[in-house]
Amino acid sequence: MTTSPGTVESTTPVSGQLRTVLSAGERPARATAVSATLTHLWRAMMAFKHFPVQLIDIVLMPLIFLLMFTYLFGGAFADSTEEYLQFYLPGVTVQAVVMMTVYTGTSLNTDIHKGVFDRFRTLPFWQPATLAGSLLGDVLRYVVALATTVFLGLLLGFRADGGFLGVVGAMLVLIVFGFSVSWIFAALGVVASEPERVSGTSMIVLYPLLFMSNIFVMPETMPGWMQAIVDANPMSHAATASRELMHGTAGFWDVGLVLCVSAGLVAVFAPLTMRLYRNKNAH
């Protein structure tokens, strides 16, 4: 069956009519920096829905360390496992948050190598929102890790003399600290050649910092040269701030120092990460 030329002409839109149809509706406004960041924050949070196995790592890692060190080594590190739990639980919360920051770098690097960021680059929104939203989404990891660790500690007999406000205050300080550290691994995630490089390099950096701190044992049991490293280690001050807040003996020094270090890390690594990201996009 053939179509007559007249029918074709009557159903073929002319350019003027097409332009009128396309311009009739009002175009949506360009996304603001805040709305774009919130959109990518939502995308990061949806990763837990589509990849729930991440929650297993987030929950199990700090719980395994808490149980292992408390009941295997607690009696050797302190007079009893109960006494060591009072010392170690605020420290393991630091470890839980810092270890979660590695996910920031690996997830960013995975998105880059899958071409997700290339697709984002073609869209008309504030490009740094991709990084900012991802890092803010990782805050959920910190909250889950902290909440489950503290909850198990309370079940095991941990006594938070600082009360509810002390525990919440410690968690807030550690969330700020973790957010600042995550910018370091975000920068690494942008420049690394593959996700495995990010995780491998992160472990090489983190494990010495975690174990050469006062998270696991008191510095007085260490050699003098190591005590100097422990005293200068930001992880130690974060652990001390967490202990002071949870036990109700908080002073301004360690809490203030952790917040100042966090602000310094963001001031240095946030612009650096953004610049590396823009340079990568330019190529």
From Swiss-Prot:
UniProt family annotation: Belongs to the ABC-2 integral membrane protein family.
Keywords: Antibiotic resistance, Cell membrane, Membrane, Transmembrane, Transmembrane helix
Stated role: Part of the ABC transporter complex DrrA1B1 involved in daunorubicin efflux. Responsible for the translocation of the substrate across the membrane. Confers self-resistance to daunorubicin, an antibiotic produced by S.coeruleorubidus.
GO cellular component, one term: ATP-binding cassette (ABC) transporter complex
InterPro entries named among the record's database cross-references: ABC2_TM, ABC2_TM_bact-type, ABC_2_transport, T7SS_ABC-Transporter
One Gene Ontology biological process: response to antibiotic
UniProt domain ABC transmembrane type-2: residue ranges: 53-280
Disruption phenotype: Deletion of the drrA1-drrB1 operon decreases by 31% the daunorubicin (DNR) titer in cell culture. The drrA1-drrB1 mutant exhibits no growth defect compared with the wild-type strain and no significant change on DNR sensitivity. Deletion of the drrA1-drrB1, drrA2-drrB2 and drrA3-drrB3 operons almost blocks DNR production in cell culture, suggesting that disruption of these operons impairs the efflux of DNR, resulting in intracellular accumulation.
One Pfam family this sequence matches: ABC2_membrane
Major localisation: membrane
Topology in membrane: Multi-pass membrane protein
One annotated GO molecular function: ABC-type transporter activity
Location(s) in or outside the cell: Cell membrane
PROSITE patterns according to UniProt: ABC_TM2 (PS51012)
Transmembrane segments: 58-78, 85-105, 150-170, 171-191, 198-218, 252-272
Subunit structure: The complex is probably composed of two ATP-binding proteins (DrrA1) and two transmembrane proteins (DrrB1).
Keyword Secreted set for record: no
Name recorded for this polypeptide: Daunorubicin resistance ABC transporter permease protein DrrB1
